[in-house]
């Protein structure tokens, strides 16, 4: 009887895309994919060396245990099962809020899915090398497949983010990490399209929520691989369906384009550890700060600051009152603006920590209170337009003596593909992060190897092995 009930169409569409779509041979998407993979691994190395807090989450659940042929966690000597390995790499990529971002009605970070993809591929590759009896037909476990998996995961998450505001229903955006990672990892594990439909059928905190979602995606794939079936209509069921109680059964999800390779070509690279909607505001503040200094004034001379922002920025990162921790601070537009004025340069992860001189600064608190925000419809429209995908902020500064520093408008901050500085700064970011643990020769070799489509994933991951940096407390 249940065999006659079709799976929900969005689930069928995702499975068909993952299994049947061929990425165009144009090098653009693959070039971007190589870039986001290196950027994400660079972010992982940065976290290892800058966040002792994140390192407490790393390593086997039971200290001292090992997993045969497991995933080698980059930057450490840990060898982990694919589920814990996905979580740990997800923590390292995401924790300092320095990994890439993608905007729309929902904001998210498609690179979160790479933790699942890399962990699963490395584990399968090492297991395959030690067994000649497996009957499962995996796709080739090479750099080329890694690139294809990344492009498809980015596309699934990116397309769903454009016009579907999960946050409006109190749902964490990492649900899309689970969706994209489960879909792609089921293909990597050699499952059929029908099995993928079960694997992608899922129903989800700042530093580790995406890691948890990616980990759950791998776990769901393993359950499906073992024969568990997914529900066929979690979206459309008349009583309990997700769409019935959220976006509406008739409206459904809004997908303005078919799945292809668009998202990977429109990703926003994070060149500073700061919630993405605040980056253009930081750049505007740096410009205004230089103007302020050039005319002989200081921050204490500011009467108030007027901001024109997108609706998304106002909703997600406008905060008044006390900020309780680092995650609270790097997700506060008033904090990052004040920080830019006080510091005079891009923020660093350390600027958000409890022991930072800015975290308990009266000057910081006073300046935050002087920032007035107004949602601007034109900036919001540009942000939501899939052809423009701007992330704009307009900033006007008023001084106590009546002087007005004319508005500085930043629509395409560094990190946006339309900003000519992005490519160079992206490369600098990667090299800076990697130098925390690797020599220039090793970094050059890693960059060379990402261009080798036929290289086994395990060989690539081996390039990142280092002594353990985790400090497990469990």
Curated annotation (Swiss-Prot):
One of its GO terms (cellular component) is mitochondrion. It catalyses: (4E,11E)-2-hydroxytrideca-4,11-dien-1,2,3-tricarboxylate + 2 H(+) = [4-(deca-1,8-diyl)-2,5-dioxo-2,5-dihydro-3-furanyl]acetate + 2 H2O. It holds the Pfam family MmgE_PrpD_N. Signal peptide: none annotated. Coiled coil: none annotated. Keywords: Lyase. Monomer. It comes from Talaromyces stipitatus (strain ATCC 10500 / CBS 375.48 / QM 6759 / NRRL 1006). GO terms for molecular function: 2-methylcitrate dehydratase activity. Gene3D superfamilies: 2-methylcitrate dehydratase PrpD. Pathway: Secondary metabolite biosynthesis. InterPro entries: MmgE/PrpD_sf (IPR036148), MmgE/PrpD_sf_1 (IPR042183), MmgE_PrpD (IPR005656), MmgE_PrpD_C (IPR045337), MmgE_PrpD_N (IPR045336). Alkylcitrate dehydratasee; part of the gene cluster that mediates the biosynthesis of the antihypercholesterolemic agents phomoidrides which are dimeric anhydrides. Within the pathway, the alkylcitrate synthase (ACS) tstiJ and the alkylcitrate dehydratase (ACDH) tstI produce the decarboxylated monomeric anhydrides by coupling the C12-fatty acyl product from phiA with oxalacetic acid. The pathway begins with the highly reducing polyketide synthase tstA that catalyzes the formation of a C12-fatty acyl-ACP, starting from one acetate and 5 malonate units. Phomoidrides A and B (also known as CP-225,917 and CP-263,114) are potent inhibitors of Ras farnesyltransferase and squalene synthase. CP-225,917 and CP-263,114 inhibit Ras farnesyl transferase from rat brain with IC(50) values of 6 uM and 20 uoM, respectively. CP-225,917 inhibits squalene synthase with an IC(50) value of 43 uM and CP-263,114 with an IC(50) of 160 uM. Its EC number is 4.2.1.-. Belongs to the PrpD family. This is Alkylcitrate dehydratase phiI.
